[in-house]
């Protein structure tokens, strides 16, 4: 396909945890030109995307005129607003919806974007009749509805994110989890300490690998955006309860045996072979504390308890849509059929955590 026929997809939040994988996946498809919006074009993350072939554009989401310029000439857009931005912690500061509205208004004024994929979430206030509210989720849902009701776009596709597998890559975060997956406790276990997900028993959670699958899932939507207009796409790589996730981490052969086998044969052990356990937390308030992130986490688990683990609300927890989209994107990238499947938690731990243990 010639450069004049390539369609431009612009990514807002391009150096973030979601936007980065989207840019990297789309760049592997010659049918698309990829424009990456960032507040800091001089950052190492932005330079890395430029080295891969992305067009880097400076843009501040709070400045509408910059959004108009950044999205001008684009055929489609992926947008994720950062709910963890400390500016939203100030009750006197504009909200995440205010930011999202400026971005959407800028896209509309740019005049060329036909297809929008927005990283949204469940309207928890409506779903629970105000009984278990996650403020960040409601802000995202409100932005989604604003975009859809504008009447400007040919298609608007809302994404619901699974729980990030990627949080287990950071050793600094492990201490907040009880040590899992990097640090042993006094009993020589790598212990995960979190509240139970669900009302009375451990309910399954949808897990997503941002680096391995998320970008390809979004890529797949842009191949046939009309198929996903107004349709929630849950991004899910694997589905497991916390105890099942611990099993995935532990699976494999003991470390010494794994070391010898991998060097003497072509067999590779899966995951880590390390001892781990899950201990449900009962005193939620004491566990999470009164920090902003602690209160946000508490709200999420209260939602899980109230809904008996309905993480996506009325949307089913399934890998079906994600698997279809991943396969389509991989085919468009020219990947081998064996490299078109979603990653499992076992495979993810083996790939991303085992080398660090």
UniProtKB/Swiss-Prot annotation:
GO terms for biological process: alkaloid metabolic process. Its EC number is 1.-.-.-. SUPFAM superfamilies: NAD(P)-binding Rossmann-fold domains. The keyword NADP applies. One of its GO terms (cellular component) is nucleus. Gene3D superfamilies: NAD(P)-binding Rossmann-like Domain, UDP-galactose 4-epimerase, domain 1. NADP(+) binds at residues 13-18, 39-43, 60-61, 81-83, 140, 164-167. Notoamides have been shown to exhibit antitumoral activities. Notoamides A-C show moderate cytotoxicity against HeLa and L1210 cells with IC(50) values in the range of 22-52 mg/ml, but the IC(50) value of notoamide D is greater than 100 mg/ml. Moreover, notoamide C induces G2/M-cell cycle arrest at a concentration of 6.3 mg/ml. GO terms for molecular function: oxidoreductase activity. The keyword Hydrolase does not apply. Keywords: Alkaloid metabolism, NADP, Oxidoreductase. It comes from the Eukaryota. NmrA-like family domain-containing oxidoreductase; part of the gene cluster that mediates the biosynthesis of notoamide, a fungal indole alkaloid that belongs to a family of natural products containing a characteristic bicyclo[2.2.2]diazaoctane core. The first step of notoamide biosynthesis involves coupling of L-proline and L-tryptophan by the bimodular NRPS notE', to produce cyclo-L-tryptophan-L-proline called brevianamide F. Belongs to the NmrA-type oxidoreductase family. This is NmrA-like family domain-containing oxidoreductase notA'. It comes from Aspergillus versicolor. The gene is notA'.
């Amino acid at each position: 396909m010639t450069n004049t026929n390539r369609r431009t997809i612009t990514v807002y939040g391009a150096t973030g945890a979601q936007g980065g994988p989207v840019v990297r996946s789309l760049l592997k498809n010659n049918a698309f030109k990829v424009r990456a919006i960032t507040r800091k074009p001089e950052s190492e993350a932005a330079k890395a995307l430029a080295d891969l072939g992305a067009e880097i554009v400076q843009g501040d989401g709070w400045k509408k005129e910059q959004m108009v310029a950044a999205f001008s000439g684009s055929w489609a857009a992926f947008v994720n607003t950062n709910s963890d931005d400390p500016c939203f912690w100030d009750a006197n500061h504009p909200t995440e919806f205010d930011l999202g509205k400026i971005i959407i208004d800028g896209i509309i004024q740019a005049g060329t974007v036909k297809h929008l994929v927005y990283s949204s979430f469940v309207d928890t206030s409506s779903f629970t009749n105000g009984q278990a509210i996650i403020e960040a989720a409601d802000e995202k849902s409100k932005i989604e509805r604003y975009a859809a009701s504008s009447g400007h776009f040919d298609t608007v596709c809302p994404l619901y994110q699974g729980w990030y597998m990627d949080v287990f890559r950071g050793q600094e975060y492990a201490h907040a989890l009880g040590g899992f997956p990097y640090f042993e406790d006094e009993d020589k276990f790598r212990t995960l300490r979190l509240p139970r997900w669900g009302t009375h028993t451990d309910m399954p959670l949808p897990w997503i690998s941002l680096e391995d699958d998320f970008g390809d899932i979004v890529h797949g939507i842009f191949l046939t955006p009309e198929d996903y207009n107004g349709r929630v796409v849950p991004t899910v790589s694997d589905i497991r309860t916390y105890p099942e996730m611990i099993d995935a981490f532990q699976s494999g052969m003991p470390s010494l045996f794994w070391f010898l086998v991998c060097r003497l044969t072509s067999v590779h052990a899966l995951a880590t072979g390390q001892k781990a356990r899950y201990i449900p937390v009962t005193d939620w308030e004491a566990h999470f504390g009164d920090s902003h992130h602690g209160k946000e986490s508490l709200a999420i688990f209260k939602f899980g308890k109230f809904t008996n683990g309905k993480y996506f609300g009325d949307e089913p927890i399934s890998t079906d849509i994600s698997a279809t989209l991943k396969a389509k994107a991989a085919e468009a990238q020219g990947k081998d059929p064996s490299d078109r499947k979603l990653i499992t938690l076992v495979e993810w731990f083996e790939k991303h955590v085992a080398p660090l243990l």
